[in-house]
Swiss-Prot record:
InterPro entries for this protein: Class_I_gatase-like (IPR029062), GATASE (IPR017926), Imidazole-glycPsynth_HisH (IPR010139)
Protein's name in the database: Imidazole glycerol phosphate synthase subunit HisH
Catalytic reaction list: 5-[(5-phospho-1-deoxy-D-ribulos-1-ylimino)methylamino]-1-(5-phospho-beta-D-ribosyl)imidazole-4-carboxamide + L-glutamine = D-erythro-1-(imidazol-4-yl)glycerol 3-phosphate + 5-amino-1-(5-phospho-beta-D-ribosyl)imidazole-4-carboxamide + L-glutamate + H(+); L-glutamine + H2O = L-glutamate + NH4(+)
Highest taxon listed in the record's lineage: Bacteria
Record note on quaternary structure: Heterodimer of HisH and HisF.
Active-site residues per Swiss-Prot or TrEMBL entry: 79 (nucleophile), 183, 185
Subcellular location: Cytoplasm
Limits of the Glutamine amidotransferase type-1 domain: 1-201
Pathway of action: Amino-acid biosynthesis; L-histidine biosynthesis; L-histidine from 5-phospho-alpha-D-ribose 1-diphosphate: step 5/9
GO biological process, any: L-histidine biosynthetic process
Top-level taxonomy: Bacteria, Pseudomonadati, Chlorobiota, Chlorobiia, Chlorobiales
CDD domains: GATase1_IGP_Synthase (cd01748)
The EC number(s) this enzyme carries: 4.3.2.10, 3.5.1.2
């Protein structure tokens, strides 16, 4: 079973429907106390980094997520949820993140590519990954974002994607912490396989 954290940051229902389609039990809750009974927690998100962190803190999710990871639970961040795992973001000022993955969230610099990135792009694997088990390298996934994650350690990077002249980290996998910048729930069969792989860990 998968616990989906509801902190008012969007795309919850589409993620829940994806798990339902896969026949995987999942619940959506804004009560972090209920998280204790789940080994797998999903942190989705669409919106602004600073506001999201405020919501997580106000609801009690910050301490609950840190405790979940500390106890060996699995955590998957999606889109903004991935960015929140890092140390800080430069989105609309400087904001502190969960610091589960040391690094910084940065804005794409101006280029010939239109920012934000909206649409399908290839994901190239950086290492053998549980999250991408039985998914073909260079598969295409659906992205919607203007900011990207720059991790301090290359060991945390599970996959990269080229956009706006930047070969950025599009997936993280380290010590039970997983994250993807793309939306697996909107990424057809490859995305559904990523969600299934997480649920089956």
């Amino acid at each position: 079973m998968v616990f989906i954290a509801d902190y008012g940051a969007g795309n919850l229902r589409s993620v829940l429907k994806a798990f339902e389609f896969l026949g995987i039990k999942a619940i959506v809750s804004n009560d972090p106390r209920k998280m204790a009974g789940y080994r797998k927690v999903l942190l989705p998100g669409v919106g602004a980094f600073g506001q999201a962190m405020q919501s997580l803190e106000a609801l009690g999710f910050v301490s609950a997520l840190l405790e979940h990871v500390d106890k060996g639970g699995h955590l998957l961040g999606i889109c903004l949820g991935m960015q929140l795992l890092l140390s800080e973001s430069e989105e609309m000022g400087t904001h502190k993140g969960l610091n589960l993955v040391p690094g910084k969230v940065k804005h794409f610099v101006s280029s010939s590519d239109k920012i934000p990135q909206i649409g399908w792009n290839a994901v190239d694997f950086s290492k053998q990954s549980d999250l991408f088990r039985n998914v073909a390298d260079h598969s295409f996934f659906y992205f919607v974002h203007s900011y990207y994650c720059e991790t301090e350690s290359v060991e945390a990077v599970a996959a990269t994607t080229l956009f706006a002249g930047q070969n950025f980290c599009s997936a993280i996998e380290k010590n039970g912490i997983f994250a993807v910048q793309f939306h697996p729930e909107k990424s057809a069969d490859a995305g559904l396989k990523v969600l299934a792989n997480f649920a089956e860990l």
